[in-house]
Curated annotation (Swiss-Prot):
SUPFAM superfamilies: Metalloproteases ('zincins'), catalytic domain (SSF55486). Single strand-specific metallo-endoribonuclease involved in late-stage 70S ribosome quality control and in maturation of the 3' terminus of the 16S rRNA. This is Endoribonuclease YbeY. The gene is ybeY. It comes from Vesicomyosocius okutanii subsp. Calyptogena okutanii (strain HA). It is an enzyme of class 3 (hydrolase).
Amino acid sequence: MVIIQNNIHDLSVNEDDLSCILQKVVKEWGKGESELLVRLVDEAEIQNLNKVYRYKDEPTNVLSFPTDLPIEIDEKILGDVVICIQIVLKESIEQHKSFNNHLMHMAVHGTLHLLGYDHIDTKDAQNMANLERKILAKIGINNPY
């Protein structure tokens, strides 16, 4: 199950589409039926989260927080993906992309982090980017890079 928490009440976000797509990502590339929370926030909130958890005092587009439940608790909760709508909008304008396509890309990117993918080294970054392209192509979004 994917839960969308739209903290900024942005009506331009199609929450049903976002939820449906991420549910498919989790099911196909992840751990079957798992719970994922997607939070849509403003710059101040994501900057605070970035400062507290990554020691970077600046806003960013997306952050992922894996669940911290003990392994003994058999809940299928992946964690949270936090997306800053304002940053995604700015980036989409700067990069000449559709806002919705860029939002989907950031949501997929954050979800893949929760599924164990990363981009710390070049090989992992290429693998993650290739998987993002594959997922986005399935929903009609061209190469985001």
